[in-house]
Amino acid sequence: MSINDKPIGFFDSGVGGISVLKEAFKLLPKEDFLYYGDSKNAPYGTKKVEEVKALTFNATDFLMSKGIKALVVACNTATSVTINDLRENYDIPIIGIEPALKPAVELKKGGKIIIMATPMTLAEKKFANLMDLYKETEDIEPLPCPGLPELIEQGIVSGDVIYNYLKDKFSKYDNEKISSIVLGCTHYPFIEETLKEVTHNKACIIDGSFGTSRELKRQLKNSNMLTEENRVGKVTIFNSREDKDIIDLSYKLFNMK
């Protein structure tokens, strides 16, 4: 098999990275994708750094054994902790994801920018460096959201539980003064509709899925690694939990409008 026809690997701590996979498949509909969700060990956002690194390397080795031509680390926490180490150890294009703060700043709406993310993403140096770029000019507030990925891993993406969680998190803010909400975890796009409801649709909601997918396409194109086949690509999903329910949930989220 030529490198062009090899699949693209996607990895996340659970089902969250499927939000990025959806965007990538729209952008690259002829490509085959292999997705590995580590739901057995989710969430990563509250684990120790060394544990996240070990789990990320295990997942990458699994996907490499399947013959992938590129890897998307569709997990903010794993990206912030491990991306440099991965690039040093594997000789394929590796694309990470980080909170889409730049697009939020470029909107220039003048209000508060809230960054929802896991505690570990917000604690890492990579995030501190990102904040340093804008902290002098922007009103930016990190909002740690522990427990939210776990709910989404259970397939709870709407209803009273999610509404009440978000209502509690945003109770300290004046919705009129929020310009943008940056979704700094790939699980969060699945609760976007409820987030709009809680904030009365006042803020722009931004996630990094499109930017990451566009970067994937750019790197593959520049390396002449895009498939040359004129066909519809396919998506195959694996999960460390190895039970039918999590695979069914994964495909359900992938097909969610």
Swiss-Prot record:
A GO BP annotation: cell wall organization
Pathway(s): Cell wall biogenesis; peptidoglycan biosynthesis
Source organism, top-level taxon: Bacteria
Catalytic activity reported: L-glutamate = D-glutamate
Gene Ontology MF terms in the entry: amino-acid racemase activity; glutamate racemase activity
Positions of disulphide bridges: none
Pfam families the record matches: Asp_Glu_race (PF01177)
List of catalytic residues: C75 (proton donor/acceptor), C185 (proton donor/acceptor)
Keywords associated with the record: Cell shape, Cell wall biogenesis/degradation, Isomerase, Peptidoglycan synthesis
InterPro entries: Asp/Glu/hydantoin_racemase, Asp/Glu_race, Asp/Glu_racemase_AS_1, Asp/Glu_racemase_AS_2, Glu_race
EC numbers: 5.1.1.3
List of residues binding substrate: D12, S13, Y44, G45, N76, T77, T186, H187
Coiled-coil positions: none
Task performed by this protein: Provides the (R)-glutamate required for cell wall biosynthesis.
Protein family (similarity comment): Belongs to the aspartate/glutamate racemases family.
Stated name of the protein: Glutamate racemase
